[in-house]
């Protein structure tokens, strides 16, 4: 009986060790889930086959190679991005997200990887030439819900009427069809949409706020993953990774920004 008990105990210990080892391996091998809203080309979008594509996707693939982890992209509505980290549904969020104090209270951000200034896409017939000329009774401003442009307009353009919409394309449509006088968003997006709608829109690039910084977000307290992301960003920049992303995704915009004398998107202080 004693011998049988010892054998059972040994068997239990062996099974426990195997199970524990298997769990550890599963954690290390499971994909890193990256949440982003696939509605913001050329950063977060889909290719012709419907697969996730864009600059942010390529950046995360490079991080996966660096970390030795498979990357799984999850298309997530903008309002669900931060909650996806809080609930553990996602490990990482990268979605052209500005580092802001209110967001930093909910998630941890990486070191900034990009600069972005707000600009205005105006209706060509609106007569809008400055941000101040939007702040008048009777003026209508299209904003993407929850975006930095939305918050800026809400705090600073109180005389105008805000048209709050779910995505960038809806805002551009409001402006190009004359239902809104302007759309406040980042310079790159404004430039691209101005080029796509040259007869119905005008671009106002006069700076009216400090550059905002974009970061990669992780769940609050995930110091290990955050440190790994920061180390990757530093090495990726040093090795010319952001220059390659610019060449592939933003070559026309880089040339235009150089001509206009604007600070480039990825020109960050070391």
Residue map of PLM features:
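Ligand-binding cleft/hinge of the Venus flytrap
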Residues: 46-48, 60-68, 137, 149-166, ...
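Ligand-binding clefts/hinges and TM-proximal coupling segments of bilobed small-molecule sensing domains
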Residues: 148-165, 202-204, 233-270
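A ligand-binding cleft/hinge motif common to bilobed small-molecule-binding domains
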Residues: 80-83, 95-105, 151-155, 176, ...
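Periplasmic-binding protein-like
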Residues: 38, 115-122, 187, 191-233, ...
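Extracytoplasmic small-molecule ligand-binding "clamshell" domains
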Residues: 28-96
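Flexible hinge/capping segments at coil-to-helix
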Residues: 122-140
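Extended ligand-binding regions for polar small-molecule ligands
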Residues: 57-66, 125, 132, 145-147, ...
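Short helix-initiation/N-cap motifs at beta->coil->alpha
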Residues: 72-84, 128-129, 145, 163-177, ...
């Amino acid at each position: 009986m004693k011998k049988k008990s010892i054998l059972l105990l040994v068997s239990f210990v062996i099974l426990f060790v195997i199970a524990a080892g298997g769990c550890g391996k599963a954690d290390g091998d499971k994909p890193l889930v990256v949440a982003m809203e696939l509605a913001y080309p050329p950063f977060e979008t889909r290719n012709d086959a419907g697969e996730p594509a864009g600059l942010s996707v390529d950046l995360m693939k490079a991080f996966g190679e660096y970390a030795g982890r498979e990357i799984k992209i999850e298309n997530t509505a903008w309002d669900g991005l931060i909650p996806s980290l809080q609930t553990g549904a996602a490990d990482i969020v990268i979605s052209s997200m500005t580092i802001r104090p209110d967001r930093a209270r909910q998630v941890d951000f990486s070191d900034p990887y990009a600069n972005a200034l707000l600009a205005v896409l105006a209706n060509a017939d609106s007569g809008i030439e400055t941000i101040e000329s939007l702040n008048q009774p009777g003026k209508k401003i299209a904003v993407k819900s929850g975006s930095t442009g939305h918050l800026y307009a809400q705090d600073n353009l109180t005389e105008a009427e805000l048209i709050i919409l779910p995505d960038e394309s809806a805002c551009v449509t409001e402006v190009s069809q004359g239902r809104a006088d302007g759309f406040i968003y980042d310079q790159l997006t404004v430039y691209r949409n101005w080029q796509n709608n040259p007869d119905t829109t005008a671009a106002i690039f006069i700076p009216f706020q400090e550059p905002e910084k974009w970061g990669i977000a992780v769940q609050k307290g995930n110091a290990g993953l955050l440190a790994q992301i920061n180390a990757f960003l530093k090495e990726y920049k040093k090795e010319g990774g952001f220059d390659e992303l610019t060449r592939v995704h933003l070559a026309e915009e880089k040339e235009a920004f150089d001509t206009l004398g604007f600070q480039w998107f990825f020109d960050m202080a070391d």
